[in-house]
Amino acid sequence: MSWRGRSTYYWPRPRRYVQPPEMIGPMRPEQFSDEVEPATPEEGEPATQRQDPAAAQEGEDEGASAGQGPKPEADSQEQGHPQTGCECEDGPDGQEMDPPNPEEVKTPEEGEGQSQC
């Protein structure tokens, strides 16, 4: 008598067919109102009124930030790591780097006993 168990291999499920966007219908510009270009001004209106309000706001922000001075980000990085005199870093992942090739390392002579940082 042979044993007939359930197979562990399952056939992949059929994928549902989704129509491509061009088959559904055209995109209506009112759905994406911020991407639509503004209407051209009439002859009587000055061209300065049709400027993008975001562009005008950027100009105001630049003037306000220019008077504040340098950003304190560089200072905060120095405060987190005290200086020890030897500024050797382990590497980008915090792991130690491979030791140098012994053939390339020069032995320190008398008077040159300083650290090789």
From Swiss-Prot:
Tissue: Expressed in a variety of tumor tissues but not in normal tissues, except testis.
Described purpose of this protein according to its UniProt entry: Antigen, recognized on melanoma by autologous cytolytic T-lymphocytes.
Family statement drawn from the similarity comment of this UniProt entry: Belongs to the GAGE family.
Other comments on record: This gene belongs to a family of genes organized in clustered repeats. They have a high degree of predicted sequence identity, but differ by scattered single nucleotide substitution. Their sequences contain either the antigenic peptide YYWPRPRRY or YRPRPRRY which is recognized by cytotoxic T-cells.
Name this polypeptide is given: G antigen 1
Coiled coil: none
Matching InterPro entries: GAGE, GAGE_fam
Region (Disordered): 1-117
Segments of skewed composition (Acidic residues): 32-45, 87-96
